[in-house]
Regions:
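Short S/T/G/P-rich N-terminal loop/turn motif that feeds into the first structured element of a domain
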Residues: 1-56, 62-75, 85-109
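A common structural junction motif
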Residues: 77-81
Length: 109
């Protein structure tokens, strides 16, 4: 069974980036407990790229069904509405990638 990499991208106007970044930082407290308890979670990252005025949530799951739990995770849905109300746009659909290969650091470096 191959793991799934889920990627969600938010874009905003450059003058709203700082506010959106702070909202994303604050979102961790709301989202972390529920996400950590989800079946199949392997890793979760929130990130920001000021150069493109974008924020991302990238996660790795054991399978597609596990990744799709995020589609109905109410705290995430609610926060998405808050971001949208502040002018954010989301790339849709959210992408769920079946992994083709992976790399890990070599233990012999």
């Amino acid at each position: 069974m191959n793991s799934v990499v889920r990627g969600s991208i938010l874009r905003c106007a450059p003058d709203r980036f700082s506010e959106m970044r702070q909202m994303m930082l604050n979102a961790e407290k709301v989202l972390r407990p529920g996400i950590e308890s989800m079946r199949g979670l392997l890793a979760y990252y929130g990130g920001a790229d000021e150069a493109t005025s974008s924020l991302t949530n990238v996660s790795v799951w054991t399978d597609l069904a596990a990744a799709k739990q995020m589609d109905t995770f109410q705290p995430m849905v609610d926060l998405g509405k808050e971001f949208a109300a502040k002018g954010a746009t989301f790339e849709r659909p959210i992408m769920n990638y079946a992994t083709l290969w992976q790399l890990r650091p070599s233990a012999t470096k």
